[in-house]
Amino acid sequence: MPKKIDAGQILLRSLMLSLSQKNDLEIHLKDITARLEVELPLIYEIEPEEISPACRELEGEIAGIARGLAGHLDLLLPCQAEVDLYSDKLGLSGRLDRLAPGNRPSLIRTGKAPQDGIWKRDRLMLAGYALLLGEKHRTHINQGLVEYPRQALVRAVQIHSVDRARVLRIRDRIRQIKDGRLPDRPDDASCQACEAREICETRHSLASRFF
């Protein structure tokens, strides 16, 4: 069954993707929200009666979001939004939320930020985008951003070589799986609660006969 679209999350993400000016930020965000109330039901499977309450709720938060983002706008703008990146050489591709100044990859997250730093999954995603951007521009991208608009936070993080290497190892594991070879399970794998446990164990058993 398809997962139901969360109108509030789509609205907040679309608001940040539409961010384009530094002046009169609160007015700018309110104007974007009014436009999105009309446009989002045309783009996504969202009914107007779903998006309207989300817009009213967001309008009540915009003043706080604008105050919080005001000190971060130089990190975010000017920018390109929803940038498609692909590398045949690296075997990686993705759609980056925001290409911020200095060719820094930036992710938009509608959930809560961790107490410190960023979530591990986002660190790996930034490392992957850094690899793609680095190859495209023939340079090392050493910093990325994660935006948490609900909390009006923008966190800058260093992208380390260990993160890049981990992305490439994950890529290699995915290639193995696509080729019908399952990589070894780590000792701490959480198999007991996994929905795919029976299928996975069967495939591991079959694979062990040949590899």
What are these regions (language model features)?
Residues 2-3, 134-140, 202-205:
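Short helix-capping/linker segments at secondary-structure and domain boundaries
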Residues 1-99, 206, 211:
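Metal-dependent nuclease catalytic cores that hydrolyze phosphodiester bonds in DNA/RNA
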Residues 41-44, 141, 189:
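Short edge beta-strand segments in beta-sheet-rich domains
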Residues 10-11, 166, 190:
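Exposed alpha-helical structural elements
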Residues 171-179:
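Short Cys/His-rich Zn2+-coordinating modules
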Residues 1, 179-211:
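Cysteine-cluster motifs in flexible loop/terminal segments that predominantly coordinate metals
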Residues 74-172:
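Mg2+/Mn2+-dependent nuclease catalytic core
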